[in-house]
Amino acid sequence: MPRASLIRQAPTRLRGAVCHCLLLGALASGQASAELAADPLDVYETLPVPYPAHWIFVHDAAFFHMFEGKMILLDPTRQEKTEQYKGMLNTSFLAPFARSDLRRELYAVDLFYSRGWTGERTDVVTIYDQATLEKIDEIVLPFAKRSMTMPEKFAAQLIDHDRFLLVFNMNPATSVSVVDVARRAFVTEIEIPACALTYPTGPRGFSTLCGDGSMVSVQLDADGRLKSRERVAAFFDPGVDPLFEEGTIIEGVGYFPTFHGDVQEIDFRGDTATVGQRWSLVSERQRAMNWRPGGHQITAADKRGRLYVLMQPDGGEGTHKDGGSEVWVYDVAERARVQRTPLQHWGNSIAVTAGTKPQLIVNNPEDMTIDVYDARSGTLERTLEDFGMETSFLVYTMHQGE
């Protein structure tokens, strides 16, 4: 008997079940005969270059496995985690970091050992493309001297229209390696005994802060070799009120807080650093309450040239790295405080984004999250977390020189 006749003679419920099975069979047969589209391979997304002004790089020092550090690129204005995370690149052993928007490149001063964490050491300037975060080149340094200290922004700086990369060395004597990133070549080593770090100075030079309270200014020739060296006489007593080396440079003038709550101006616009005015961050009443700076990266600046300082109450001997509970903002032209921002969580480092709506970025040392505040109102907007961070001590913004 034909199939249609059998179906018509079946009870209503059975007839419906049979029709349903036939329909599923027909669909399955059609799906089996159709070819599945192949998943696309080798799909690469690129980032906008130059990066948006409000993006940040967070340095993960990876304290428990330092040869696997990373720089994580984030958009702190976004609410969703999938929109905050833009990418990352690997770094090794607390690598100093620099960014060139002129060359659209990123530089990590890595060091490697031939057998993981032991064996022969090699120091390398690893070069990444900003758009893809892919490694595009490297410059091997001729000796293993790159400093391996807590992350410092002034441990690697670009000068002379981003042609020369300055790398701070300590082994244990201190020096600076000059690397020509345009020619992809090491140039020279300049000794800076008893001094540390590199603050861009003049047209093609740097200054370095010395342990006796003085400073040395160096200028390079067109090839990147030593042209001149001048010592700036001691201008502070490290045994009485030391300077934090983590200053901030605003339009060529550096602002360096002291342990006891002053700030020292240093003008880096000429061939040789010029010591400027020293003024107080605190009132006499606040000084009596032991308000003072504290933390790792304790200063930042916004596009308007305002100075941000991480402050702690009840400070004392040995608390200079403990972080702080407030950020105080200063008009450097007036040398006066204009804003006071209490933090929701204790902070260890700060940064301020370069966008038209600046955000205050604060590292939380307890759980390694990042708090994002409206820099002008002081309102906590969001907390960045669960983005692959282990030990964050430093945030780089898109300001020139970071």
Residue ranges and their predicted role:
Residues 50-63, 108-122, 309-324:
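Short, conserved, GDST-rich strand-edge loop motifs in beta-rich repeat architectures
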Residues 38-46, 90-99, 146-157, 192-203, ...:
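Repeated scaffold domains used in trafficking and secretory/extracellular systems
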Residues 76-79, 130-132, 180-184, 220-223, ...:
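Short loop/turn segments that connect beta-strands within beta-propeller blades
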Residues 36-40, 80-89, 134-147, 183-190, ...:
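A short beta-strand motif characteristic of beta-propeller blades
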Residues 132-175, 183-197:
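Asp-box/WD-like beta-propeller blade repeats and closely related beta-sheet repeat scaffolds
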Residues 291-332, 340-356:
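Loop/turn-rich, solvent-exposed surfaces of beta-rich toroidal or solenoidal domains
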Residues 62-65, 112-117, 172-173, 213-215, ...:
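Short glycine/acidic-enriched loop and turn motifs that connect beta-strands
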Residues 52-54, 102-104, 161-163, 203-204, ...:
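Short coil/turn segments that connect the beta-strands within blades of beta-propeller domains
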